[in-house]
């Protein structure tokens, strides 16, 4: 049996296919979903969602949101998402390095809003790099 997975952002549908299994970056850790999973609603962290439509796994960078599992359908509603295959690994690596430096700089100061923004940007850059297949 398979699961129908839809990844939806405010702008578009990023993924709408059947998969054998998927792994979600929930706020409590990685969450594996197979067919006939119990109904579930979970918050998602910024990270990499992995789907296996056939033999091979595919990565999707997700920028936080929610996932609902019910009746072999998974709806993933996120602030942003990109297929790993569409992300340029080199530019993702450069963005990650820049975000890492900005986070280190922000953490030296006392400006909490700036620290939170830098941390969020770092998580997004890390998710994009990992989805593109780059090591962090």
Curated annotation (Swiss-Prot):
Primary location recorded for the protein, binned into one broad class: membrane
Keywords carried by this UniProt record: ATP synthesis, CF(1), Hydrogen ion transport, Ion transport, Membrane, Thylakoid, Transport
Ranges in a coiled coil: none
Gene Ontology terms: cellular component: plasma membrane; plasma membrane-derived thylakoid membrane; proton-transporting ATP synthase complex
Pfam families: ATP-synt_DE, ATP-synt_DE_N
Regions of compositional bias (Basic and acidic residues) in chain numbering: 105-114
Membrane topology listed for this record: Peripheral membrane protein
Localization annotation: Cellular thylakoid membrane
Subunit-structure text: F-type ATPases have 2 components, CF(1) - the catalytic core - and CF(0) - the membrane proton channel. CF(1) has five subunits: alpha(3), beta(3), gamma(1), delta(1), epsilon(1). CF(0) has three main subunits: a, b and c.
PANTHER family membership: ATP SYNTHASE DELTA/EPSILON CHAIN (PTHR13822), ATP SYNTHASE EPSILON CHAIN, CHLOROPLASTIC (PTHR13822:SF10)
Free-text function comment from the UniProt entry: Produces ATP from ADP in the presence of a proton gradient across the membrane.
Entry's family note: Belongs to the ATPase epsilon chain family.
HAMAP family hit by this protein: ATP_synth_epsil_bac (MF_00530)
Protein name, entry field: ATP synthase epsilon chain
Organism field: Synechocystis sp. (strain ATCC 27184 / PCC 6803 / Kazusa)
Encoding gene, per UniProt annotation: atpC
């Amino acid at each position: 049996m398979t699961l129908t997975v839809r990844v939806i952002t405010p702008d578009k549908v990023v993924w709408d296919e059947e998969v054998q299994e998927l792994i979600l970056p929930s706020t409590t850790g990685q969450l594996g979903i197979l067919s006939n999973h119990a109904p579930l609603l979970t918050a998602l962290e910024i990270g990499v969602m992995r789907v296996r439509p056939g033999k091979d796994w595919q990565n999707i960078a997700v920028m936080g949101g929610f996932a609902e599992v019910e009746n072999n359908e998974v709806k993933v509603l996120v602030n942003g998402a990109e297929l790993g295959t569409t992300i340029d690994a080199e530019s993702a690596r450069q963005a990650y390095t820049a975000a890492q430096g900005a986070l280190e700089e922000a953490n030296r100061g006392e400006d909490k809003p700036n620290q939170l923004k830098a941390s969020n940007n770092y998580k997004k850059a890390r998710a994009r790099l990992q989805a593109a297949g780059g090591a962090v």
